């Protein structure tokens, strides 16, 4: 496994950062819920130390050999260092400098997926829709295949959270920007046409007596 230079480059990060990432996960949750006091201050300090350790391991691994698939892959695991209250233009400029997301070779890895999840973690759940809009607006400027794959990934995530109103909004706003892939287009159409409270699409059926019936002309109300 460790024979190739790129595998060694990846392992240099994973081996050193695995424990630190585990600690960070625990400390983040602790800092969220623990009341003010000396212990909270100590936990925040420890969290900062562990995050710095991960970033150091990451930078060291990337610099082993710049330009390789491994280094490009690892670059999307860097911490997203900006204040979410900054203007959209500033955030987009930061992303274009640090996370270009234009490398098709990374599309079948989890690099871009990891970036999107990390981006969302900077926001409260109530702001996820706006955060995803920022990501999609950024991606829309680049490669359509990458945009479509990540749009599909975002839809899957919002579907798993049962955020159906957000799915409708995203489908309306970005559905025309995705590729002509049949499955994605069909999925987008289902979110816009069949959302809760929307009027059902009209269609014609044949009864067992051979009579054609149009849904909109049936006597019973429908939604």
What is the predicted role of each segment?
Residues 1-208:
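Oxidative protein folding and maturation machinery
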Residues 211-223:
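Short active-site neighborhood of thiol/selenol oxidoreductases, capturing the structured segment around
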